[in-house]
Regions:
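Extracellular, repeat-based ectodomains that mediate carbohydrate processing or recognition
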Residues: 1-186
Length: 186
């Protein structure tokens, strides 16, 4: 979107999963977009692309989960950035439902190995914020005996920095939306 209101549309990837939300963050002097890709065999891994000097980079895979599903999971990734430090959180289910987190120290050009945030009774609908101290706080929807809760947990590059905490009860229906975190300070 230009200051004059013109929209310059560009196709980043022709195989973006149509129903999963995308997310965007500013990393240094570039925009970083994350999304769920959809290969010819319906493998739905998370990809990242940067808008640098007016052109989109070739997308990179955040992690090859190799989740194959012949339907849209309606469960896209989340990204947060501070300069070249980037955190991406996502839901995946190649063998069981999981929430994962990966860090990048080069603005999303490459990503480290994923950290396991949660597994088992997770629904997904993730969000992430990146704090000044480098910790990423991940939130997700988890199934309970009585419905669902929104959970949040801080992580550093080595793993969990504290325990997961239930933030609020929630409805499991898709119509309840996707919980979002807002960083107020720090």
């Amino acid at each position: 979107l230009t200051p004059a209101g013109a929209i310059d549309g560009s196709e980043i990837d022709a195989r973006v999963c149509d129903c999963c939300q995308t997310d965007v963050a500013v990393s240094g002097a570039a925009l970083l977009v994350v999304y769920r890709n959809r290969s010819e065999d319906d493998t739905r891994d998370i990809q990242a692309a940067r808008l640098e000097n007016g052109a989109w980079t070739v997308p990179v895979t955040v992690h090859a989960d190799e989740w194959r599903i012949d339907a849209c999971p309606v469960n896209g990734p989340a990204v947060a950035a501070r300069d070249d430090d980037v955190a991406v959180a996502w839901f995946t289910a190649p063998d069981q439902p999981r929430v994962r987190l990966a860090f990048s120290a080069d603005g999303g050009r490459t990503f480290g190995p994923p950290l396991e945030v949660a597994s088992g009774r997770v629904i997904g609908r993730v969000d992430v914020v990146l704090l000044q101290d480098g910790h990423a706080v991940v939130s997700w929807l988890a199934a309970t005996a009585n419905g669902a809760v929104i959970r949040a947990q801080p992580f550093n590059r080595a793993g969990a920095a504290d325990v997961a905490r239930d933030v609020a009860t929630a409805n499991v229906a898709r119509s309840s939306g996707f919980p979002q975190m807002v960083q107020v300070a720090g």
